[in-house]
Amino acid sequence: MPLLETRDLCKSFGGLQATRDVALSIDAGEIRGLIGPNGAGKTTLANLITGIYAPDSGDVRLRGERIDGTRPSRVARAGIARTFQNTRLFGSLSARKNLLVSYDAVSGSALVSPAAARERAGHLLELSRLAAVADLPAAALSGGQRALLQLSCGFMHPRLALYVLDEPFAGINPVFIETILELLSHHRQHNEVAYLIVSHEMEIMRRICDRVTVMIDGAIYFEGTLAEAAANEGVIDAYLGRPV
């Protein structure tokens, strides 16, 4: 059974059909890239998976259980975290406090003591190289540091199964990108976290993705490795423009 599965997922906004019969499956521990031209429906699909939008038809299943149509908070507690292209943090709170607030939001009935949550936050601050700025307000951090903090907030989830990342590398200094990649690898290796990564950064996607899904005009056009996508004439014409 796949970790995540969408079936015939459709969503329209007025006369615009943003997704059309999207059928996607992701296995535990998989890193899946989601690529395609602007307006292809990638972010809409991410929003459908994470409960921000309810589908017009079709369904979303996590470990076989339907999660579509439920509140984003319930989807999060079920094991799905999400980052946004525009970083969402509590600017007046310290980096450490942002992590602890994130844990409180998703922990539910998880039996983790406050001391264990603080230890988890400290460990993540070390992994993300943010320990030196742990007690600074998030608003005082650089763009790269805020991106790392937002990513780490999702890793506070005690039952994280799938992490949906929307343009996590856009506008980020290469030094911070390497730290992001280290974090993704660490949690995949130790916790079998799966990722759905929306990005236009093809060189990075080549390095980390097991497979990519190409969306065009709201529908899945191609699935395979990035090398296979880069050799597909339709993908080249509609999106890549040239081999990568």
Residue positions per predicted region:
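Helix-to-loop junction immediately C-terminal to a conserved catalytic motif
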Residues: 50
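Conserved ABC ATPase "signature" region
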Residues: 114-133, 182-185, 234
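The feature captures the beta-strand-to-loop junction immediately N-terminal to the Walker
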Residues: 35-37
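H-loop/switch region of ABC-family ATPase nucleotide-binding domains
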Residues: 199-200
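A short, surface-exposed alpha-helical micro-motif characterized by mixed small hydrophobic
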Residues: 205-207
